[in-house]
C-alpha cells in the first residue's frame, strides 16, 4: 500500500498517477484519505490532552478537599473523562481502518517508463530473441500430444478434480523435474537461496502482498479458516519478514521460491482443452529480492536478465514486453513480461512476469531497513519478484517448439544432464 505520509505530502502525485492509469474515479479516495487523516490527527491531539487532564485532575481534587473547596465540578469532569477518551479512541480506530482500506486499494506509483495504454494490446515490445522454427508437418496440440504419448491424463484429472487439472506422467514428470533443477541451479550460481514456503498463508499477511480483489477472483480459501492456498511463492516469501527490520549489510537478500501455485481464475481467460497453459495448479520457481530503494531498478533488470537466460538456454524464442498502464495492476511500479513463441497459435504467450513493487508491499507488511549512518532511522525496503520458470507453461513451449514428425519431442540440450542424457521423449 502507499504510506499515509506520502499521500499527505504528495497528493497531487497520487492523483496524477491515477489519471495516468485511467482510473480518475479513485481521485476522490485521495481527498477522503486526507480528510480522515486530518480528523485522526485532530482526535489524537484531543485524546492526548484528555489523558493529560486525567493525570492532573486527581491532584486538583485532592487539593480542593484539603483546602475545603468545592470538589464537585472537578469530580463531574473526572467522571466524564474516561467516556470521552473511549469515544475518541473508538472514532480514531474506525477512521484508521477506513484510511488503511483506502490506502491498500490505491495502486502503486508508476515508474515514468511505463507506457500509456488501455489493456494488454498496448503493451510495448522491447526486443525479440530467437528465430521461430518452421515445421513441414502439422503440429499436434500440446495437450493431445501429451495424452497420446501417455505423458498426461486430463480426462481422469477432470473426473477426480474438475476442469483445469491434470495428471502428469512418465517422461513429462521427469522433464518437469529437470526444468526445476535447471532453474534452481542457474539461480543458485547467481546468489539466490532456494526456499520452499508454506503452501497456505493467513489473510492478514496475504493482504499485504496482493491486490485485494484477488481474494474473490484468484485465491482458494480454506473453509472454516482465514487461510488461503498460495497463488505463487512470491506471496509467503514477501510476508516472511513481516514486521521485521533488516540491517543494510544483509541486503540485497535474494531468494528463489519453489512451490505449487493454486489459482481459481482460469475460467475468466479461457481454458485450453486438454492443456497445460491455464490450469488451477502448477509448479513455479520464483525469484524474489528484498533490497535498499536505491538498488531496486538495477535489480529489476537483473531479474529480467535471469529469466531471459532461462529461456535462451532452453532454446525457446521469446520477446520481452513493457506492460502498459492499463494492464499492470495495482502492486507493481513497473512490470516486464516475457512471452514465449507458441507455434501452433503463431503467437507469443506469457511465461514470465517480472515486477518491481518498490515499497508498496513493504509498507503493508512493515518491512524496513536500518540506516547504517543513523541507528534510529529506518526506511522501507523495496521488493521485487520475477518468474524464473512456471513448469507447466514451459512444458507446453517444449512440446510445441521441439515436437517431431513421429510424435516424439526432442529434449533441450541444457536439460539432458538431468534426464540421464536422454535425447527424446
UniProtKB/Swiss-Prot annotation:
What class does this enzyme belong to in the EC scheme? Answer: ligase
Which Enzyme Commission number(s) are on file for it?
Answer: 6.1.1.11
What is the reaction catalyzed? tRNA(Ser) + L-serine + ATP = L-seryl-tRNA(Ser) + AMP + diphosphate + H(+); tRNA(Sec) + L-serine + ATP = L-seryl-tRNA(Sec) + AMP + diphosphate + H(+)
One Gene Ontology term of the biological-process aspect is: seryl-tRNA aminoacylation
Keyword Cytoplasm in annotation: yes
Q: Which gene encodes it?
A: serS
PROSITE patterns per UniProt: AA_TRNA_LIGASE_II
Any idea which positions bind L-serine?
A: 232-234, 286, 387
**So where does ATP get bound?**
263-265, 279, 350-353
Record's keyword annotation contains Translocase:
no
Cellular component GO terms, alphabetical: cytoplasm
What the record says about family reads:
Belongs to the class-II aminoacyl-tRNA synthetase family. Type-1 seryl-tRNA synthetase subfamily.
Q: Quaternary structure per UniProt?
A: Homodimer. The tRNA molecule binds across the dimer.
According to its UniProt record, where is this protein mainly located? cytoplasm
Looking up InterPro entries in the UniProt record yields: aa-tRNA-synt_IIb, aa-tRNA-synth_II, aa-tRNA-synth_II/BPL/LPL, Ser-tRNA-ligase_type_1, Ser-tRNA-synth_1_N, SerRS_1_N_sf, SerRS_core, tRNA-bd_arm
Q: What is this protein called?
A: Serine--tRNA ligase
Q: Which organism is it from?
A: Methanoregula boonei (strain DSM 21154 / JCM 14090 / 6A8)
**What's the record's remark on domains?**
Consists of two distinct domains, a catalytic core and a N-terminal extension that is involved in tRNA binding.
Its subcellular locations are: Cytoplasm
Query: Which molecular-function annotations from GO does this UniProt entry contain?
Result: ATP binding; serine-tRNA ligase activity
Amino acid at each position: 500500500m502507499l504510506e499515509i505520509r506520502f499521500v499527505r505530502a504528495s497528493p497531487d502525485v497520487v492523483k496524477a498517477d491515477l489519471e495516468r492509469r485511467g482510473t480518475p474515479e479513485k481521485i476522490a479516495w485521495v481527498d477522503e484519505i486526507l480528510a480522515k487523516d486530518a480528523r485522526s490527527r485532530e482526535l489524537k491531539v484531543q485524546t492526548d490532552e484528555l489523558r493529560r487532564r486525567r493525570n492532573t485532575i486527581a491532584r486538583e481534587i485532592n487539593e480542593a478537599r484539603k483546602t475545603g473547596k468545592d470538589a464537585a465540578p472537578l469530580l463531574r469532569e473526572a467522571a466524564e473523562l474516561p467516556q470521552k477518551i473511549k469515544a475518541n479512541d473508538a472514532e480514531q480506530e474506525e477512521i484508521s481502518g477506513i484510511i488503511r482500506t483506502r490506502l491498500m486499494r490505491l495502486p502503486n506509483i508508476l515508474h515514468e517508463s511505463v507506457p500509456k495504454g488501455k489493456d494488454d494490446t498496448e503493451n510495448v515490445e522491447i526486443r525479440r530473441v530467437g528465430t521461430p522454427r518452421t515445421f513441414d508437418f502439422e503440429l499436434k496440440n500440446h495437450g493431445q500430444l501429451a495424452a497420446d504419448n501417455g505423458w498426461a491424463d486430463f480426462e481422469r484429472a477432470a473426473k477426480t478434480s474438475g476442469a483445469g487439472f491434470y495428471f502428469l506422467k512418465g517422461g513429462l514428470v521427469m522433464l518437469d523435474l529437470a526444468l526445476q533443477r535447471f532453474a534452481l541451479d542457474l539461480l543458485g550460481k547467481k546468489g539466490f537461496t532456494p526456499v520452499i514456503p508454506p503452501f497456505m498463508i493467513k489473510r492478514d499477511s496475504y493482504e499485504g502482498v496482493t491486490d485485494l480483489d484477488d481474494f474473490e477472483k484468484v485465491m482458494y480459501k480454506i473453509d472454516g479458516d482465514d487461510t488461503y492456498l498460495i497463488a505463487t511463492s512470491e506471496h509467503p516469501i514477501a510476508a516472511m519478514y513481516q514486521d521485521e527490520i533488516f540491517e543494510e549489510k544483509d541486503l540485497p537478500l535474494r531468494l528463489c521460491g519453489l512451490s505449487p501455485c493454486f489459482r481459481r481464475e482460469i475460467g475468466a481467460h479461457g481454458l485450453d482443452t486438454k492443456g497445460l497453459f491455464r490450469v488451477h495448479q502448477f509448479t513455479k520457481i520464483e525469484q524474489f529480492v528484498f533490497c535498499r530503494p536505491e538498488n531496486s531498478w538495477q535489480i529489476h533488470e537483473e531479474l529480467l536478465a535471469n529469466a531471459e537466460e532461462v529461456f535462451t538456454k532452453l532454446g525457446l524464442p521469446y520477446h520481452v514486453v513493457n506492460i502498459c498502464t492499463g494492464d499492470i495492476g495495482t502492486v507493481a511500479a513497473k512490470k516486464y513480461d516475457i512471452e514465449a513463441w507458441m507455434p501452433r497459435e503463431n503467437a507469443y504467450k506469457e511465461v514470465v512476469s517480472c515486477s518491481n513493487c518498490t515499497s508498496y508491499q513493504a509498507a503493508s507488511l512493515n518491512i524496513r531497513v536500518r540506516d547504517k549512518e543513523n541507528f534510529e532511522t529506518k526506511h522501507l525496503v523495496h521488493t521485487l519478484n520475477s518468474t524464473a520458470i512456471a513448469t507447466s507453461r514451459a512444458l507446453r513451449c517444449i512440446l510445441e517448439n521441439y515436437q517431431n514428425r513421429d510424435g516424439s519431442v526432442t529434449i533441450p540440450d541444457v536439460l539432458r544432464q538431468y534426464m540421464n542424457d536422454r535425447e527424446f521423449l
